[in-house]
């Protein structure tokens, strides 16, 4: 199925690209989430009419993400959790806990933006946590987990 992308999608294309994708991917993911539209003649004409506005919105999202990344880079957050004698946590610290700690510090971060490639944190110590703010913008914070 041929679709027109309404935003940049990793490993697929940029705003305005006409791409061929499997029908299920288009029907179940791209179209319902507003990331693409079917490439019919009328949709192509409508997209070309809105292209400037969509590019401006994409640029605003990116600049907003870059300003957030500038605030977040080199930030250090401390989370206190109950831990045993050897530093093993009773429970774990996940993406929601990190996002809540950042929000409490006055920075707006969603849990879907926090990346923990090695899974949840189960030990006390210092960790570098990646934040995926936009398809082109990454930030990194220092997370300190202390036993309480």
UniProtKB/Swiss-Prot annotation:
Domain of life: Bacteria
Alphabetical list of SUPFAM superfamilies matching this protein: L9 N-domain-like, Ribosomal protein L9 C-domain
Pfam families, per database record: Ribosomal_L9_C (PF03948), Ribosomal_L9_N (PF01281)
InterPro entries assigned to the protein according to its UniProt record, in alphabetical order: Ribosomal_bL9, Ribosomal_bL9/RNase_H1_N, Ribosomal_bL9_bac/chp, Ribosomal_bL9_C, Ribosomal_bL9_C_sf, Ribosomal_bL9_N, Ribosomal_bL9_N_sf
A single BP term in Gene Ontology: translation
GO terms for MF: rRNA binding; structural constituent of ribosome
Keywords: Ribonucleoprotein, Ribosomal protein, RNA-binding, rRNA-binding
Any one GO cellular component localisation term in the record: ribosome
Classification via PROSITE patterns: RIBOSOMAL_L9 (PS00651)
Role according to the record: Binds to the 23S rRNA.
Protein name: Large ribosomal subunit protein bL9
Organism: Azotobacter vinelandii (strain DJ / ATCC BAA-1303)
Gene of this entry: rplI
């Amino acid at each position: 199925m041929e679709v027109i992308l309404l935003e940049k999608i990793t490993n697929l294309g940029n705003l305005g690209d006409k791409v061929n994708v499997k029908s299920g991917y288009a029907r179940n993911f791209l179209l319902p989430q507003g990331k693409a539209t079917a490439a019919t003649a009328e949709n192509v004409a409508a997209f070309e009419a809105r292209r400037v506005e969509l590019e401006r919105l994409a640029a605003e999202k990116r600049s907003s993400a870059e300003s957030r990344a500038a605030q977040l880079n080199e930030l250090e957050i401390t989370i206190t959790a109950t831990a045993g004698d050897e530093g093993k946590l009773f429970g774990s610290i996940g993406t929601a806990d990190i996002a809540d700690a950042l929000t409490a510090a006055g920075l707006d971060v969603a849990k879907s933006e926090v990346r923990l490639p090695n899974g949840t944190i189960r030990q006390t110590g210092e960790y570098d946590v990646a934040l995926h703010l936009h398809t082109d913008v990454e930030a990194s914070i220092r997370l300190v987990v202390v036993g309480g």
